[in-house]
Amino acid sequence: MGKNAIVGQSGGPTSVINASLAGVFESCKSRGADIVYGMCNGVAGLLEERVVDLSTVLTDDLDIELLKRTPSSFLGSCRYKLPDWHEDEAVYKKLFAILEKLNIGYFFYIGGNDSMDTIGKLADYGARIDSDIRFMGVPKTIDNDLMVTDHTPGYGSAAKYIGVVMKEIIRDATVYGTKYVTVVEIMGRNAGWLTAAAALAKSDDCEGVDMICLPEVPFNVDHFVEKVRVMQEKKPSIVIAVSEGVKLEDGRYVCELADDVHAVDAFGHKALTGTARFLANVVARNLDTKTRCI
């Protein structure tokens, strides 16, 4: 390689994000990188020059194998939104000065869509100033919603977890003979892959969830209530998996019907909360049944 490499982790952790980190470290070292740095808390930490020589903490094969099986993000994470360079070029100048100081030739960033936004901005700015640093995004997201990526590391583990938990919820919901509707809210702003994984609960010993509501399909509250009513004519206990990001035909999030959503994160995304609670309350008001939201 001739130059050093640096790698960071960003966004929410997954069960396998550290396996990707181990892969980057091993690949860079095997291809001649003198030093492979790790950013402590992603780009936010890099701006403060908080980096670590990974060879000092990954000293042998056992360390690397343990890292692959270590949960959460080994290097720490951040949700730092990198501004556009023409709005705040000083941030870019500082970052590239730090990278030059560390003799970086290869920059890896492990994360989801927002992290790919960061790596894209850095690559564009690097091209603008004729930098020879190579910027590479390493896919990571439990949502499985990265463009041109069939399945992202992290989704499989999350999907398996959801399938297991939903089966346990179904078992719990059927212990009483009374009418009961359980609405389970699952992550997924615009992509329904995680919610769809609730279907994995179905097996020879479990009939599975009764309804799955995805953000890709326009949601109608009245139709939803009617479907629940019809289902309860056949069985008392109903379990529903609903994505946090289900939307009405006019584009509004269902959770906005309950309360105005004002809070946003660093990337400007609305804070989605209360979808299951809202739908459980609607069912309770319109049907003679107990409800709960999870």
Please give the residue ranges for each predicted region.
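N-terminal phosphate-binding or glycine-rich loops at protein starts, especially the Walker A/P-loop
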Residues: 1-51
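Short, ordered loop/turn segments at secondary-structure junctions
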Residues: 10-12, 39-45, 79-80, 112-113, ...
